[in-house]
Structure formats: structure tokens, C-alpha cells
Regions:
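Anionic-ligand binding region
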Residues: 73-109
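Active-site environment of divalent metal-dependent phosphoester hydrolases
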Residues: 1-6, 66, 91-102, 116-121
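Short, solvent-exposed coil/turn segments
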Residues: 42, 51-52, 104, 122
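Divalent metal-coordination and catalytic microenvironments
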Residues: 40, 60, 94, 112, ...
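Short, acidic/polar N-cap/turn motifs at the starts of alpha helices
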Residues: 44-48, 97-98, 124-126
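Active-site neighborhood of divalent metal-dependent phosphoester bond hydrolases
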Residues: 1-48, 54-58, 70-85
């Protein structure tokens, strides 16, 4: 979490970040230990996880550039760059816009955001993936009414 680290190192003003993103970063610094913060700062930019023989590539942004945003209306040629012969699912975030795209060998999914959806304020987005049959379901609800 680059923004969190910059706030922690006093390289950016937390008030500016709070105006744009809310108080999550401030709460993290207040309530997490230095060890927990260090863990977050040193997470890999990309990771592979296998559950029930289903392979997931985890990314914050695009697989080739974690700072690149992918949107539902991103050009197909760009989305196809996410195709992976080594993974069943390629999971991305960063844009907070929920969408999925069948890349051929893998399914690209951005589940959106529970707390900061960019599609519509107050809507929580998430995705459930069934590792028994490789099915997935994208979900959303009004955040205050979510189960």
C-alpha cells in the first residue's frame, strides 16, 4: 500500500488523502502495529494462489504494471494481455470498477470494491468464485444493507 507507506513516512499530507479516500489510511496507522504495517509495505506486487486445483493470479493493477488501471471499457486488445495459460483466474483491482472478461485461457475479474465503488457511491461490489466448478458470480448491494 504505497499511499499508506507515504503517510507513515510523513512524505504526504494525510489530510489531502483523507479528503479523496476517506479515513481508512489514518485508521490503519492508528491501529496497526509497526510490524503489521511493515508486512503490508512489503507484500509482493503479484502473487499466485492455488485453491482446490484452481489457480489465481492476484494483482492490484494490471498484471504487467500494478499502477495501470483496467476498466470495463478498456480496449479488448489490452484486456487480452491479461490472458494467462498458467492461471484459471486473473484478479485485478485498482480501478474499483467491477467487471469480468473471458480472456480465453483465463477469466479476468475485478470485483470492484466493498468500501469505495467507483460505479456508484454507496454500492458494495464483490465476487464469489466457486473452486469446485470454476463458476463465479458478481454481486452488489447498497452498502448499509449488505448481508
Amino acid at each position: 500500500e504505497v499511499i499508506l507507506q507515504l503517510i507513515f513516512e510523513k512524505k504526504i499530507d494525510p489530510k489531502i488523502i483523507k479528503q479523496k479516500y476517506g479515513s481508512g489510511h489514518e485508521l490503519a496507522i492508528k491501529h496497526l502495529t509497526n510490524s503489521q504495517l511493515s508486512y503490508l509495505f512489503n507484500l509482493p506486487s503479484q502473487r499466485t494462489v492455488v485453491l482446490n486445483d484452481i489457480s489465481f493470479q492476484l494483482n492490484h493493477g494490471a498484471p504487467w504494471d500494478q499502477d495501470e488501471y483496467l476498466y470495463p471499457d478498456t480496449k479488448i486488445k489490452t484486456l487480452l494481455r491479461c490472458n494467462s495459460i498458467n492461471h484459471n483466474f486473473v484478479l485485478v483491482g485498482h480501478s474499483h470498477y467491477s467487471f469480468y472478461f473471458d480472456c480465453g485461457n483465463s477469466i479476468l475479474i475485478n470485483c470492484g470494491s466493498v468500501g469505495q465503488s467507483r460505479k456508484k457511491g454507496g454500492i458494495a461490489n464483490w465476487t464469489l468464485i466457486d473452486t469446485n466448478n470454476k463458476s463465479y458470480k458478481m454481486n452488489d448491494c447498497l452498502a448499509k444493507f449488505c448481508p
